Amino acid sequence: FVPKPFAELRRLGLTRETEARVRAAYPQQTGLLVVEQVIPESKAASDLEPGDVLVEVDGKLIAEFVPLAAVLDNSVGKEVTVAVERGGQRLERRLQGDNLNDITPDEYIEYGDGVFHKLSYQQARHLYRPVSGVYVANPGYVFGKAAIPRGSIVTGIGAEDVKDLDDFERIIEMLPDQQQETVRYVSF
């Protein structure tokens, strides 16, 4: 979400009625929050779009980050009803609250003098990718010799998909010593 002034929100489709309601409830407020980006394949990807104007969460007007963060922090593992306006239409969506700690790297694997961990939410957001794959923090000897650069995301080894660090570990443990294998990755 990013803050946007009312003048820009009207161009995005905020109705006059909603603007009047927000201005009456929060006279000092100069705008609302807008969806800037949605992580591909996330739980919200099918419900929210960039440009959606956030109006309410669980029936309460939300105009700033702090109240939004408080509601979301208290909604981990629960559903929340989010009301947005898109192109002049009010839409209500039920979204599942996620714990950011669950999609933040908390372990790593050292392999062939390299360092690998799961792709973090922050990196996925920055790269506009699903939170899937393994991040190459340091390619080390094995991946460096294969010219796989630091900052790449490993998505597969051989015929196997790599969705997370557990997949990566399982696959590399099964590889015989000195065996070469195809690695699918993306780099930015």
Map each language-model feature to its residues.
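C-terminal recognition in membrane/secretory proteostasis and scaffolding
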Residues: 1-188
